[in-house]
């Protein structure tokens, strides 16, 4: 007597489970990178909102604004978002700091900067890892926080990967 086989064998089920596991293992890191990049984009958006005030101050006074107040923008703790702790202006450098919680763990507490340089009668802006500007000689250098304070380059958009010495 022949009986018809109904359903799946144990081997077939194990193969399906293995395939689903492999797909999940590939998709999860890609999704985490995607969420980190989306959260970093909020920091860039908030920081870019300060560019016009900083540029205007520089063009009117010939020096970079020393802080948020002199730039004519809200205090650093008032410029925040869902993923951004603060946006600070210091010697014309706009630095956004990510929150230390409720953010992708790879970017928690990390920073990115927007800074400008005078070139051929205009002001050119750059975006990248955190930098500082020496107010006396107007030089821009990499922030001394080390790698702990830097957002990994893979989480920065391609338009925000300038080196501190870019021109």
UniProtKB/Swiss-Prot annotation:
GO terms for cellular component: membrane; pilus. Glycans are attached at residue 70. The modification N-methylphenylalanine is found at residue 8. SUPFAM superfamilies: Pili subunits. Residues 1-7 form a propeptide. InterPro entries: N_methyl_site, Pilin, Pilin-like, T4P/T2SS_Core. Keywords: Cell adhesion, Disulfide bond, Fimbrium, Glycoprotein, Membrane, Methylation, Transmembrane, Transmembrane helix. It is found in: Fimbrium; Membrane. Major component of the type IV pilus (T4P) that plays a role in cellular adherence, microcolony formation, resistance to neutrophil mediated killing, twitching motility as well as transformation. Mediates the attachment and the formation of bacterial microcolonies on host epithelial cells. Mechanistically, pili retractation induces host NF-kappa-B activation in infected cells, which is temporally associated with the formation of gonococcal microcolonies. The pili are polar flexible filaments of about 5.4 nanometers diameter and 2.5 micrometers average length; they consist of only a single polypeptide chain arranged in a helical configuration of five subunits per turn in the assembled pilus. Belongs to the N-Me-Phe pilin family. This is Type IV major pilin protein PilE. The lineage of its organism: Bacteria, Pseudomonadati, Pseudomonadota, Betaproteobacteria, Neisseriales. The gene is pilE.
